[in-house]
């Protein structure tokens, strides 16, 4: 089910591209890309349980097809398998990057959950949420690939540039994803649209809508979100 679930595989692709850019000649970059994809897939399995999602990449989600318990357990397995593979890569700095990213991703999910229906959520706080829950794994992908390719860190400026690229790429990715939840087509995207609003998630389109709405429009949106949060 997981291997046939589709998806863009952007995060592992960034690992391979960054390794190629730095002329890495070994084989551990493939294992590193696998680790990144395992971590990402684990977060998706858990997210679908938290969000009670029924559609992912055009297919029925694992929690809908089997059960929440099965999804959580398989997600846990992928996390543990990812860390087992980290040991095989044999780099403490890379393990540090990936373990820290995994921890911050969980913090970001909790931060988002605790702000459902929060009409006062600022754009700055929203950006912090997407940095934690989404962009950090993109950053970890390019940063860890850079360290794998240059373990002595002789190209510090290039390593930092690749790390920043991953971070900014991840932020841009989430901004577009949040916009598509309002403006996209569910058939094209392979997932439901309107879920963020239905779940009371304060994403940038909704934050900006509240900022630019008339008093009547703000009241209507506020009542809807209060009803959802209850």
Residue ranges of model-derived segments:
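Mg2+-dependent prenyl diphosphate-binding active-site environment of isoprenoid biosynthetic enzymes
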Residues: 1-218
């Amino acid at each position: 089910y997981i291997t046939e679930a589709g998806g863009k595989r952007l995060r592992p692709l960034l690992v391979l591209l960054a390794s190629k850019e730095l002329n890495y000649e070994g084989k551990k970059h493939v294992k590193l890309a696998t680790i990144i994809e395992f971590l990402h897939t684990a977060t998706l399995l858990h997210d679908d349980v938290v969000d009670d999602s029924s559609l992912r990449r055009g297919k029925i989600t694992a929690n809908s097809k089997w059960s929440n318990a099965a999804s959580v357990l398989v997600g846990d397995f992928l996390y543990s398998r990812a860390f087992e593979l980290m040991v095989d890569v044999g780099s403490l700095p890379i393990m540090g990057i990936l373990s820290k990213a995994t921890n911050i991703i969980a913090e970001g999910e909790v931060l988002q959950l605790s702000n459902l229906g929060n009409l006062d959520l600022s754009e700055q706080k929203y950006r912090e949420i997407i940095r934690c829950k989404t962009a950090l794994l993109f950053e970890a992908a390019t940063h860890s690939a850079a360290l794998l390719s240059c373990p002595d860190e002789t190209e510090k400026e290039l390593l930092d540039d690749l790390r920043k690229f991953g971070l900014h790429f991840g932020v841009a990715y989430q901004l577009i994803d949040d916009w598509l939840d309002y403006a996209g087509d569910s058939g094209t995207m392979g997932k439901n649209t309107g879920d963020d609003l239905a779940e009371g998630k304060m994403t940038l389109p909704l934050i900006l809508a509240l900022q630019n709405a008339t008093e009547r429009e703000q009241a209507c949106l506020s009542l809807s979100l209060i009803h959802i949060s209850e």
